[in-house]
Regions:
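Short beta-strand segments
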Residues: 6-7, 58, 146, 173
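Short glycine-/acidic-enriched loop or helix-start segments at secondary-structure transitions
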Residues: 23, 66-68, 181-182
């Protein structure tokens, strides 16, 4: 969805016109560059215009073939630099993370007493998703609800037919996206 470029003085995010407004709240520390053409082309034009001599890339964020192509094109592997930069959060980022977690937590508190024997996994998943959206979430990136034997499947898709039985284990793994920051909660 985006190409990021970090210089010694500023961070830039090159993204498509339709994505740029959505990224702005989550990227207050960088300049969003709205590109109508290709994101890579926009970043390359910027690099040439600013006469930037060395460009690094995050090898963990690209596949092997693309990494080889970037290296052959003269880019340098930046190792874990991007990950190190993202480890430290600004106050506004921390606030967004907390809000994302609060939305998910509040949704669980509302849904937990509603879970009853005979409900399907899908019905419970829909309840938790609707509560997160009602609570202010921008999107639901994942929402796993499983009962009984299905709790052993880490990537289970909630079933429309599997119903909760009496005294059966319930596992929920869910989270929401809020202004570019995701929460991730597991409850059983």
């Amino acid at each position: 969805e985006a190409v990021f470029l970090v210089t010694p003085s500023k961070a830039y995010c090159f993204t498509r016109t339709m994505i740029a407004p959505k990224m702005a709240p989550a990227a207050s520390f960088m300049k969003i560059v709205d590109v109508d053409g290709g994101m890579v082309d926009g970043a390359l034009a910027f690099i040439q215009d600013k006469k930037i001599k060395t460009v690094g890339f995050a090898p963990a964020k690209v596949n092997f073939v693309l990494g080889q192509q970037l290296t052959q094109a003269g880019l340098v592997s930046a190792g874990g630099l991007v990950d190190e930069m993202r480890m430290v959060k600004y106050e506004d980022e921390i606030a967004r993370l907390k809000k994302s977690c609060q939305i998910a937590s509040d949704a669980f508190k509302k849904v937990k007493p509603l879970i009853k024997t005979g409900m399907t996994e899908h019905a419970v998943a829909c309840l938790i998703a609707s509560q997160m959206i009602a609570g202010g979430a921008d999107a639901i990136p994942f929402n796993i609800v499983c009962f009984g034997e299905n709790t052993a499947d880490a990537h289970h898709t909630p079933s429309k037919t599997r119903k909760l039985k009496n005294n059966e284990a319930v596992l929920m793994d869910f989270g929401c996206l809020y202004e570019g920051y995701s929460s991730d909660m597991t409850r059983s």
